[in-house]
From Swiss-Prot:
GO MF annotations in UniProt: acyltransferase activity
Chain intervals with Low complexity compositional bias: 24-43
Top enzyme class: transferase
Intracellular or extracellular location(s): Cell outer membrane
Protein name stated in the entry: Lipid A acyltransferase PagP
Active site: H100, D145, S146
Length: 231
């Protein structure tokens, strides 16, 4: 009887021990599984926007196809022109005034020659503010010149811009262009470069170019207004 009691006692201990040993792993596995879920490599792998951003930046830094054949010295210029064309806002150009410098043109001469100062015209362009806040523009438009002939022009302009207020900006710079006039080279297109200035307010801007010259030609302040459309 004593042997049976001892045997039963030992068997009972073994059963209790075995139950404890089998019941404890689930809690361990749950905690371990939770820790695995929290620190699993899958979660860290999901932080892939960095990889996507790097891929996008790689794509953004890819050389435009049109710049592939440019000399390395001029490739930055090509990249900037491509950026203005692809990322810039579309600008509507409205031309309206050309002031003949009264210090080189007398009032009598202006009356005699009947110089036109209402330089009506218009066209389209692209405008872009770079990472420093300076403005780059591509444009093509036509207007009535001093003799009321239609003068086409196309070019690139750059303005170093200062922020006067949040919405109001002003800039100074230059423009390189190609134009054609019947009184100069008989309408054969020729290049030129002129100083530019501009003021910006929201989507509106007024830009002016001074065309140097002599007492019989040039010395004209040309003014054009632009409106920028949303992309």
């Amino acid at each position: 009887m004593n042997k049976l009691t001892v045997r039963n006692f030992i068997v009972g201990l073994l059963i209790v021990f075995s139950l404890n040993s089998f019941s404890s792993p689930p809690s361990i596995s749950n905690s371990s599984s939770n820790s695995i879920d929290e620190n699993s490599p899958i979660n860290t792998f999901k932080i892939s926007p960095d990889n996507q951003t790097s891929k996008k930046s790689d794509l953004a830094t890819e050389e435009p196809k049109g710049c592939k054949y440019w000399l390395s010295l001029f490739k930055p210029v090509c990249h900037r022109l491509h950026q203005v064309w692809t990322e810039g806002h579309t600008d509507l150009y409205l031309s309206g005034y050309a002031w003949h410098n009264r210090f080189t043109y007398s009032a009598e001469r202006i009356r005699e020659k009947k110089y036109n100062e209402l330089a009506w015209g218009g066209g389209l362009g692209k405008g872009f503010f770079d990472e420093k806040g300076n403005w780059h523009g591509l444009y093509a438009f036509a207007f009535l010149d001093s003799h009321r002939n239609v003068e086409p022009t196309a070019g690139y302009a750059y303005l170093r811009v200062a922020n006067i207020t949040k919405e109001f900006k002003a800039g100074l710079g230059f423009s390189v262009l190609v134009t054609a006039r019947p009184d100069i080279f008989h309408n054969i297109p020729f290049p030129g470069a002129v100083p530019w200035a501009g003021i910006f307010y929201k989507k509106l801007s007024v830009k002016a170019a001074y065309i140097p010259g002599s007492s019989t030609n040039g010395n004209v302040l040309y003014v054009v207004g632009t409106y920028s459309f949303d992309k």
